[in-house]
């Protein structure tokens, strides 16, 4: 089929997809008036001290840090697909209040997301994201124990790092949080199944052969993928402020980023790295109403990690850290405690 033919098919399908977005808007508009997050400063993370880390292929990653470099433990947060570091706002607030100077936090925008640089299509892979995470850890927390917490694509990034840098899990990383994620691709379930249609295929073809056209037609292009992600974000009715923030992060993500990462999300498989992750305390958490990565994927992941804590969040959608922050924050507290304990045990073993 010619490019124009594929684009014709794409345009003909937008009415149906737009109606899905309309359902999301109606649900948001019907939320209760008592605003839980009225006055919440969701830009607080963006005012933290900033640095830039260059990846091995020259992409600048924007990194922000909270806490003293002398803190006994650092937590590195890795966000998911079509999000940015602000997706961790409620966890940043909680960890700062709960742990104070005992825990330092590092946040960054993944390549092609937020304020970080735009990569080429061929480097939009989970493997490359793993190398990026390794670079952030090396430059921003060069010594001391580290807990890594990844959501969605950020969890996949963390598992990729285990494949590439098992030495970090033997020496530095003392805990791993895997939220709403999977070790293998999405082509069989969740988001992958939703993306198996000729509309998405047409748009992928256009992104490969005519990226200028795709970027110019970004309004039309967003109607392909974003309604699926919006509908899957929450399993329950949430605060309008949270819905607005997640919408804004999605809307500000480049169309090319949205498309260029689809292939790797569907096909990646880092299952061979799970024994490395199994050597440190781990948390596996997912909502059982997640339509992007189903809870069954988290069950399978936890079964492969000896001693993993599996947390099932009843009614939770894909943005579970926004939707059920109390449950997520409590689970993170337990992971941090286990990370501290693992570090103490490792030091004692080294002395013996």
List where the protein language model places each region.
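Hydrophobic alpha-helical topogenic segments used for membrane insertion/localization
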Residues: 2-30
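Conserved HGGG/HGGXW glycine-rich cap/lid loop of the alpha/beta-hydrolase fold
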Residues: 59, 64-118
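Active-site glycine-rich loops that stabilize anionic/oxyanionic intermediates
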Residues: 80-84, 152-153, 182
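Conserved alpha/beta-hydrolase catalytic His-Asp/Glu region
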Residues: 212-276
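Short beta-strand/loop motif that positions the catalytic acidic residue
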Residues: 277-278, 284-286, 290
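Catalytic active-site module of serine/aspartate enzymes centered on a nucleophile-bearing elbow/loop
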Residues: 306-352
């Amino acid at each position: 089929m010619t490019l124009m033919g594929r684009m014709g098919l794409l345009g003909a399908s937008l009415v149906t997809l737009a109606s899905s977005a309309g359902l999301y808007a109606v649900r948001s508009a019907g939320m209760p008036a008592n605003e839980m997050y009225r006055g919440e400063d969701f830009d607080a993370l963006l005012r933290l001290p900033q640095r830039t880390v260059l990846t091995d292929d020259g992409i600048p990653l924007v990194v922000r840090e909270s806490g003293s470099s002398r803190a006994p433990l650092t937590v590195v947060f890795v966000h998911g697909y079509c999000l940015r570091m602000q997706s961790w706002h409620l966890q940043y607030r909680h960890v700062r209040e709960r742990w104070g100077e005992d825990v330092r936090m590092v946040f960054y925008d993944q390549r092609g997301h937020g304020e970080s640089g735009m990569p080429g299509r061929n480097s939009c892979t989970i493997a490359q994201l793993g190398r990026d995470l390794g670079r952030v850890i090396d430059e921003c927390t060069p010594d001391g124990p580290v807990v890594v917490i990844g959501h969605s694509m950020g969890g996949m990034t963390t598992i990729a790092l285990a494949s590439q840098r098992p030495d970090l899990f033997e020496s530095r990383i003392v805990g791993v949080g895997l939220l709403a994620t999977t070790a293998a691709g999405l082509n069989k379930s969740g988001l992958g199944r939703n993306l198996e249609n000729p509309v998405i295929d047409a748009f992928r073809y256009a992104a490969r052969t005519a990226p200028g056209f795709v970027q110019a037609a970004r309004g039309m292009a967003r109607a392909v993928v974003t309604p699926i992600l919006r509908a899957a974000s929450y399993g329950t009715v949430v605060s309008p402020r949270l819905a607005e923030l997640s919408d804004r992060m999605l809307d500000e993500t480049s169309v090319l980023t949205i498309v260029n990462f689809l292939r790797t999300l569907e096909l990646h498989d880092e299952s061979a790295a799970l024994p490395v992750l199994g050597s440190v305390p781990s948390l596996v958490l997912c909502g059982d109403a997640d339509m992007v990565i189903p809870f069954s994927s988290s069950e399978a992941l936890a079964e492969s990690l000896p001693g993993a804590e599996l947390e099932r969040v009843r009614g939770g959608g894909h943005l579970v850290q926004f939707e059920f922050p109390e449950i997520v924050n409590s689970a993170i507290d337990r992971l941090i405690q286990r990370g501290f304990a693992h570090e103490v045990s490792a030091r004692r073993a080294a002395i013996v």
